[in-house]
Regions:
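Divalent metal-coordination and catalytic microenvironments
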Residues: 21, 35, 45, 55, ...
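Conserved beta-strand hairpin/beta-sheet module of binuclear metal-dependent hydrolase folds
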Residues: 8-62, 66, 158-179
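Active-site neighborhood of phospho(di)ester-bond hydrolases with catalytic His/Asp-centered motifs
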Residues: 44-46, 69-77, 96-99, 147-150, ...
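Active-site environment of divalent metal-dependent phosphoester hydrolases
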Residues: 51, 77-83, 103-106, 153-156, ...
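Accessory terminal helices/loops
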Residues: 1-8, 165, 182-267
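Active-site HxH/HxHxD metal-binding segment of metal-dependent hydrolases
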Residues: 22, 50-53, 60-135, 235-236, ...
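Mobile, glycine- and charge-enriched loop segments
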Residues: 130-131, 149-198, 264-266
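Metallo-beta-lactamase
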Residues: 2-3, 12, 17-19, 68, ...
Length: 267
């Protein structure tokens, strides 16, 4: 689903706390989250530049100051996740993090891989290149970074602990689950045959299966039914996001879709 960037306000959604220090401040189709580390905010995937004014307002609604954003972390470099980064960095000067193999998309060396159609991408040079096994640490946050290529070559998945009322749970986000970049048309148009995108995606599913996740954090709202769970929380279900079974079910569905794609759209 592509967003209508000429009418971003039509996507507005109330911000809310998911669990502990993790908050949703974004919209659809892609998600934006913040983590209050106690020593500053970490924002994951600031989204489209056209949506940034609403993201900043949502951060304020939750009682935080956007100027306290210290780190801007990206799951991958596509426009719907990183389009606002240039403007946000110019505004607050936060440090940017991105998987090393996606930095050439962000900085404009491979502009055709941004998945932007006819939309504009303000390129930027990420400050910190993320590699497999790296940790992003700030205050009470210790976020493990796992390379999970396929959707893009530099896709990064994130896993970290969240504590609330003395209870610590494991949160996890798969950095790129979309199949749009796995189609034969996309691969042939961009001459990506040598990269074995589908093989990489398969290995990334297997890698993510090794992780236990109590709180599945989607980088698109449809992955974990973000808004449905928000509504259940507002109706009184305080543990709407606390379902460890969601993660393996999500990964199994990705595997089924990949198997179907290999049959219906061979390379």
């Amino acid at each position: 689903m592509a967003a209508d960037l000429l009418a971003p306000w039509t996507y507005y959604r109330r911000p809310f706390r998911i669990y502990g220090n993790l908050y949703f401040v974004g919209f659809k189709p892609a998600s934006t989250h913040i983590i209050d580390t106690g020593e500053g905010l970490v924002i994951i995937d600031p989204g489209y530049q056209e949506f940034l004014y609403m993201v900043l307002e949502n951060i304020r609604i939750l009682g935080f100051d956007p100027k306290d954003i210290r780190y801007i972390v990206h799951s991958h470099a596509h426009l719907d996740h990183a389009g606002a980064t240039y403007a946000l960095k110019q505004l607050i000067g936060a440090k940017t993090f991105m998987g090393e193999n996606d930095c050439s998309i962000a900085n404009g060396k491979h502009p055709t891989l941004t998945c932007i159609g006819n939309k504009h991408y303000n390129h930027f040079e990420p400050d910190q290149h993320i590699h497999d096994g790296d940790h992003i640490r700030l205050g009470n946050l210790d976020m493990e970074c796992v390379e999970t290529p396929g959707h893009t070559l530099g896709t990064i998945s994130f896993f970290w602990n969240i504590t609330q009322d003395g209870r610590t749970l494991r949160a996890g986000m798969m950095g790129g689950a979309g199949f749009n970049t796995l189609s034969s048309q996309y691969i042939h148009e961009h001459q990506l045959e040598a990269e074995d995108r589908r093989g990489l995606y398969q290995k990334s599913i297997q890698r993510c299966r090794q992780e236990h996740v109590d709180i599945f954090v989607g980088n698109h709202v449809g992955q974990n039914d973000t808004f449905g769970k928000q509504e259940r929380m507002e109706a009184g279900d305080t543990e709407a996001f606390l379902h460890p079974e969601d993660w393996p079910i999500f990964l199994e569905n990705l595997q089924k879709r990949l198997d179907e794609l290999n049959v219906s759209d061979p390379l």
